[in-house]
Amino acid sequence: MEERDISVDLRALQDVIKVNFNDINQLLSAVTHRSYLNEHREADWDHNERLEFLGDAVLELIVTDYLFKKYPDKPEGELTAVRAALVNTVSLSETAEKLGLNDYLLMSKGEAK
């Protein structure tokens, strides 16, 4: 990957999440909010919305599979409620904050507040 003048250390982020990307540009896109690109027109990479869409679906599938196997006697309604409690904006935001992931996000000055 060519060196870019960005304010986030992608190598350090890979260490935090314990995943090494074959294509570091995917990670760069994953941490880039659309608002950042609006303020940095020179940026030549994508924002994270499409990856967010895919990630949400993958996360829901993984959690669903886990709950389905872990609780074979629970009815669908209970499993859905547990999944909803685990996979929601508040719980995911809290987890991201605990991991320090917010420090790696590229957002506009207005969004960062």
Model-predicted segments: where are they?
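RNase III-family endoribonuclease catalytic core
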Residues: 2-113
